Amino acid sequence: MSPMSLQDQVATRRTFAIISHPDAGKTTITEKLLLYGNLIQSAGTVKGKKSGKHATSDWMEMEKERGISVTTSVMQFPYKGATVNLLDTPGHADFSEDTYRTLTAVDSALMVIDAAKGVEQRTVKLMEVCRLRDTPILTFINKLDRDVRDGIDVLDEIEDVLNIECAPITWPIGMGKSFKGVYNLLTDTTVLYKTGQGHTVQDVREVKGLNNPELDEAVGTDYAEELRDTLELVQGASHEFDLERFLAGKLTPVFFGTALGNFGVDHMLDGLVQWAPPPQPRDATARTVEADEPKMTGFVFKIQANMDPRHRDRIAFMRICSGTYRKGIKLKQVRTGKDVRIADALTFLAGERDNVEEAFSGDIIGLHNHGTIQIGDTFTEGEELAFTGIPHFAPELFQRVVLNDPLKSKQLHKGLTQLAEEGATQVFFPLRNNDVILGAVGSLQFDVVAARLKGEYGVDCRYEPVSVATARWVEADSDKELAAFERKAHDNLSRDGAGHLTYLAPTRVNLQLAQERHPDIRFRETREI
């Protein structure tokens, strides 16, 4: 068999992320996808919070304790001729920045909705992010094996709240204890549900034709009649699937099922492989980069410290945007201008790492990082270009970090700077004193940092309140203007972990006054990396 060309490799890639509100069942779906990709033999490993078994994709100590996905992990698996790259995103509300950046590295997204709760606040936020790039969205309405809301209601809510058209591909028959299966509107086939099959891929029974007497026999006449009546309503009130509108991010195909009961996930996966786009062109400073160009380019969207407690290492996650990675390739790190030879890139199955011989556009690889790689770094085979649109946000909460052992100050600085590189928190060093201030988007991040400083760096610390209301990165057209501002506003200025000058405002009013007094200084809420 001749090896596949780059064009063929790119055409088979599907790189997507899962977005959902916490507890909508995202981790369970991740497990089931791996089951269909033959990566795990039994998908009984996510019972999250109560049972002792832990989800395959939630591998950091703290996640194991809390049952939330705090870090984005990457999993690659084969399915029906495609190579699927799944990026798992943190489901907890505090981790929006990490999730935001992950969504810059995918070509499509799967939205998971709890059928009992409908559209929840976190999903709304994530959809706004997908909107910015018109990311195509598939929808899985989960937990049909529980008592849930009416399907038409849930679709109406998705259309109203998320402002996207819904095209149901499958439709549920019954729910809760009397959930019977789903009817596929495109193939005119009913797929029947049997309980207690959550751990393995089972053969399912299918009935062809909506008016087939076998259907009445299989689900009962009442349910069959109700399905026929409901479908008339559904087809009258909803949109038909339209590939162009889906690819433009305007319409979402909707699948119903139960991830825990291992039912319906494969229907969604079939849709993903059939309709979701392969790797797309990417905007860079100099030009747009096509996915099937022969030379390799890529950008780092995430850095994860200590993925392997045995190795005390940091891994930079890189999305390949064009070309082929081959072991030993020489790449230019555009920000520093340095050439690096990469012989030990990794691929992932949630904590299981393997050295990769080659990888293609659309794939995610891990680079060993000894402090030289930053989020947003572009790597090329020599060309001067940088991929755009990977943001840092100004934090909203601040605490002063106080060491319980003053002799550990060096380890504290190192630990905080490394953890800040991951992008979930930011560290600030005020110019006027030796304080260390930690900034975050949500309060859980402070707990995460304290736990990781202790567990991974041997640093015991506590937090104290600090009078900082908000932070802004400051820029000016000339170094002279910036230096003058630095003298005048010295008491409010700090450097962040990457050395950028930052204004820490004690109040919103103070920030407003500073902006009025210094019109030649730009106060930025986000910093493009």
From Swiss-Prot:
Coiled coil: none annotated. Pfam families: EF-G_D2 (PF22042), GTP_EFTU (PF00009), RF3_C (PF16658). Residues 11-280 form the tr-type G domain. GTP binds at residues 20-27, 88-92, 142-145. GO terms for biological process: regulation of translational termination. The keyword Transport does not apply. It comes from the Bacteria. It is found in: Cytoplasm. SUPFAM superfamilies: EF-G C-terminal domain-like (SSF54980), P-loop containing nucleoside triphosphate hydrolases (SSF52540), Translation proteins (SSF50447). CDD domains: RF3, RF3_II, RF3_III. One of its GO terms (cellular component) is cytosol. Keywords: Cytoplasm, GTP-binding, Nucleotide-binding, Protein biosynthesis. One of its GO terms (molecular function) is translation release factor activity, codon specific. NCBIfam families: prfC, PRK00741.1, small_GTP. Increases the formation of ribosomal termination complexes and stimulates activities of RF-1 and RF-2. It binds guanine nucleotides and has strong preference for UGA stop codons. It may interact directly with the ribosome. The stimulation of RF-1 and RF-2 is significantly reduced by GTP and GDP, but not by GMP. Belongs to the TRAFAC class translation factor GTPase superfamily. Classic translation factor GTPase family. PrfC subfamily. PANTHER family: PEPTIDE CHAIN RELEASE FACTOR RF3. This is Peptide chain release factor 3. The lineage of its organism: Bacteria, Pseudomonadati, Pseudomonadota, Gammaproteobacteria, Oceanospirillales.
